[in-house]
């Protein structure tokens, strides 16, 4: 069962949705909740070429940025603490200094899942564009990562995109044993050009769920279209509250973010996505 959740916050609108989901799950499953804010010192203080005699200016600028970043991290962590208390959920708030992805991965060892926004802005003090924290965490996290879109739509049930293989099987097992389905129906979605292969894949996952008494249904799709397109279309039609996705085909899980299937799904998925570790 889900006993502890880590949510990593950066103060962005995407981060707000991640916080909402983390608080909801902590309340629903009576799980311990940890909220992490990271002061991105390595990026703020990184070496860079400066004109002769300008080193003092850079030092002063870096110190000002560090002070501002610290205040911002403390502010959104305080806001989160207030939100969680209002929801009746006790939360442990952690302020760290260092590389954001490394800090998240380190704290993940203490928890069952990591909740992270689909678009991350941990380098907020030095850049206005999204950073690569999510990709780095997906490659290195010892725990499943729940990738949250900017908006949290209403939904019910779970869709499991099951492609077979060791990593996909482990993802399904971890998801089920954490109890996150909470008794809702799990739709096992399998995709293949050959009908027999598609049905065989969905049957594998369905047998596992049946052995555990989990409500489920099989949905084998015969299609030559790109798998990401099929998955996203099904999610939009079914409107689940969660998508569970493991490795597809021959791609190892550590390289999931680099594969076209998972990258495309995570980029456009309208619901939170549970990605196995």
Give the residues covered by each predicted segment.
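Structural beta-alpha unit
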Residues: 1, 40-43, 67, 71-114, ...
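Small/aliphatic-rich secondary-structure junction motif
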Residues: 1-60, 140, 153-221, 240
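Short, flexible loop segments at the rims of nucleotide/cofactor-binding pockets, characterized by
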Residues: 11, 91-94, 122-126, 164, ...
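Gly/Ser-rich helix-loop-strand patches that form or flank binding pockets
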Residues: 19-21, 26, 93, 101-152, ...
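A short acidic, glycine-rich active-site loop
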Residues: 56-72
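Short, small-residue-enriched loops and turns at beta-alpha junctions
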Residues: 122-124, 193-198, 224-225, 251-252
């Amino acid at each position: 069962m889900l006993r502890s959740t880590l949510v990593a916050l950066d103060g962005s609108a995407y981060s707000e949705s991640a916080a909402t989901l983390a608080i909801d799950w902590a309340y629903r499953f009576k799980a311990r909740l940890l909220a992490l804010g990271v002061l991105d010192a390595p990026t703020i203080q990184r070496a860079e070429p400066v004109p002769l005699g300008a080193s003092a200016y850079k030092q002063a600028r870096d110190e000002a940025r560090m002070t501002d970043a610290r205040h911002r991290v403390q502010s959104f962590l305080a806001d989160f603490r207030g939100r969680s208390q209002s929801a009746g959920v006790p939360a442990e708030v952690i302020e760290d200094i260092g590389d954001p992805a490394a800090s998240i991965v380190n704290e993940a060892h203490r928890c069952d899942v990591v909740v992270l926004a689909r678009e991350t802005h941990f380098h907020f003090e030095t850049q206005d564009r999204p950073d690569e924290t999510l990709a780095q965490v997906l490659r290195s996290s010892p725990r499943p990562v729940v990738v949250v879109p900017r908006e949290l739509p209403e939904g019910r049930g779970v869709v499991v995109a099951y492609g077979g293989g060791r990593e996909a099987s482990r993802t399904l097992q971890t998801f089920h044993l954490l109890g996150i389905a909470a008794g809702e129906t799990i739709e096992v979605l399998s995709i293949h050009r050959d009908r027999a292969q598609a049905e065989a894949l969905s049957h594998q996952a369905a047998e596992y769920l049946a052995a555990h008494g989990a409500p489920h249904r099989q949905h084998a799709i015969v299609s030559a279209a790109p798998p990401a397109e099929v998955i996203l279309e099904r999610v939009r039609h079914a409107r689940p509250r969660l998508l569970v996705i493991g490795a597809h085909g021959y791609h190892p899980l550590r390289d999931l973010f680099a594969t076209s299937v998972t990258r495309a799904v995570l980029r456009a998925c309208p619901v939170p996505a549970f990605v196995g570790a």
